[in-house]
Amino acid sequence: MRYNQYSYTKASEEVMLDELARLGFTIQTTNSPKENLHHFLQKILFRYQDVNYVLSSWVADQKTDLLTFFQSDKQLTEEVFYTVALQVLGFAPFVDFDDVTAFCKEIHFPITYGNILENLYQLLNTRTKLGNTLIDQLVSEGFIPESNDYHFFNGKSLATFSSHEAIREVVYVESRVDTDGDGKPDLVKVSIIRPSYEGQVPAVMTASPYHQGTNDKASDKALHNMNVDLSCKNPRTITVQESSIQTIEPQGQASLVEKAEEKLGHIGSYTLNDYLLPRGFANLYVSGVGTKDSEGMMTSGDYQQIEAYKNVIDWLNGRCRAFTDHTRQREIKATWSNGKVATTGISYLGTMSNGLATTGVDGLEVIIAEAGISSWYNYYRENGLVTSPGGYPGEDFESLTELTYSRNLLAGEYLRHNQAYQAYLDQQRKDLERETGDYNQFWHDRNYLIHADKVKAEVVFTHGSQDWNVKPLHVYNMFHALPAHIKKHLFFHNGAHVYINNWQSIDFRESMNALLSKKLLGHSSDFDLPPVIWQDNSQAQNWMSLDDFGNQEDYSHFHLGKGSQEIRNRYSDEDYNRFAKSYQVFKNELFEGKTQQITLDWTLEQDLFINGPAKLKLRLKSSTNKGLISAQLLDYWPAKRLTPIPSLLEPRVMDNGRYYMLDNLMELPFADTPHRVITKGFLNLQNRTDLLTVEEVVPNQWMELSFELQPTIYKLKKGDQLRLVLYTTDFEHTVRDKTDYHLSVDMEHSSLSLPHKKS
């Protein structure tokens, strides 16, 4: 374990004494540090009748148990304090450590012994070995009453709301869109879990088209065959325009009622939301248009879908109506809401956070967009190519639409609406232009970057450098598209497409508590986060604050060599079938230099801290009238590295409230690996200038082009080896072209440029 503490805010002596007193601690500045520590321990051991037994079970040093120490005239020293503090946090002397000073240095222990008041205050804010902060662990065990009222400590709301007394209800928000064309505003189901509280509370909203269930069978049937050739496109200039959606006004009258009539049963939830509920934040789960128990079509990422989610925020602020059921006869207002909202969730859920932020809707104070898409084109396409998300060959937009159109899971809805839905889906297939892979109006209408100037909320991103599903380009582009005055924070980790709120190494959920307590509850606090919090790839459990993602002025340039080298596209039938059957086999052989490729290796002569997108400048020609170029850059030598999928450290040990929704403690393993993909990228040679320009590829005519690979942050050391592989067809991401052509690369006039921080 290594501490990386971002949620803690230094406080004045007056504030510390006051907050400690509110918790029942009577720390006296006139007492000795030893006396104050003794009182502190007696207080936190409230579950025990015989506190002396516990003290006798702990040690003060390698020769003295803690009870004996307090009964002696020995002074409290730095070594004794650290030994006791570590035991309070769940570490075991003689098991986890022998040398306490060395161990504190090893785990980057955040407390510096000196001021016992500040030390004990910070100790309560420090994470235990099992993930909860000490104060959260104590509260979960009943340290203070479950009062259904707010109680703050170090700027964070404590779990003083009963999750068992929470109000669970369902309402149906009247949206301002009519996506199924029936002349009525689409109703959207909202599942609510909110604290039992006499006043008003804020909400964390998760906009998830998956929440009401998914139609996996229909989605699987809609997958595309990737074993097709790359198309030769007609040269043209693509034009797009900014469009707006049609909205519909509220219809009819309804009587006003005070209580919802539909009770919410068990639902799947997000553990960050679970953590926030007993701290006084209502949880809202919204599936949106086209989903089970809601109305409308699944418009998949456009601003009609986003408008319906936005209308839920409007309802929380009194600007839209909600009904108790589909009859629309009884209206219910969100009188419990203080109007302030944060959004949460990963992938499609984080995508909707991005989209919602670009509406500038009043009441949306914070988005927590985890691995969210910023432009749908960049999810299913790349530089004029059809590209499948990592791990999902053959998926395209209509298979996602089929997956999330869960209205068809209700047989009656299927009978009434499936014919119209199939016609809608047929039109979507045409609009995708899968044959060309080109950008067009369909994709432009699902590009949130062009509306980023409207963002008013504070923005938190999380994203993984090894996320080849929603690639790092999405967060990089959104991060830089935001207006300069918007506060933004990026947690850039080394995982894949994963959550980070239950990781041992980073106090992410506590940081979100501090931010939302400040922004949604109005609690006065000096809490702030740096622009970028980056997980250091060179060692286990180490995070660093950075000023920016990209925007580096310095580049390291690597020339590709001399002469010309050739990349053949067509494989033997045997190899083609092997690779098409398992893209992982292809990847393994690609990295080992065994496929049809150009392989270049460099040994670094100095440390290199990459920050931003790598740039490839190539001079090449194709033997035919089309072609694609693929590139991957690897950290290529056997070493210990962070692996991309979190592993389980301890099951169900993090209490999100008070005996409520236990979460697993997870972390990225630091393990021996043969190599690591740093970045990758793909380009259709007919789109070598830009997305809106489709050009002719003249056979055997040299072309000069440059394109950026996926942005990343990655630390390399002197002596490390870089491997660049250039090839054509990628059996995981691109169409699997069988055309018998080759690319010739002019090595002398081609180069790789890596942006880096100054050393």
UniProtKB/Swiss-Prot annotation:
Subunit comment: Homodimer.
Per the Swiss-Prot or TrEMBL record, the active site comprises 347 (charge relay system), 467 (charge relay system), 497 (charge relay system)
Q: What is this protein called?
A: Xaa-Pro dipeptidyl-peptidase
Can you name the source organism?
Streptococcus gordonii (strain Challis / ATCC 35105 / BCRC 15272 / CH1 / DL1 / V288)
| Subcellular locations according to the entry | Cytoplasm
Q: Where is the signal peptide?
A: none
According to its UniProt record, which reaction does this protein catalyse?
Answer: Hydrolyzes Xaa-Pro-|- bonds to release unblocked, N-terminal dipeptides from substrates including Ala-Pro-|-p-nitroanilide and (sequentially) Tyr-Pro-|-Phe-Pro-|-Gly-Pro-|-Ile
Q: Which UniProt keywords apply?
A: Aminopeptidase, Cytoplasm, Hydrolase, Protease, Serine protease
EC top class, in one word? hydrolase
Gene this protein is translated from: pepX
This protein's GO cellular component annotations are: cytoplasm
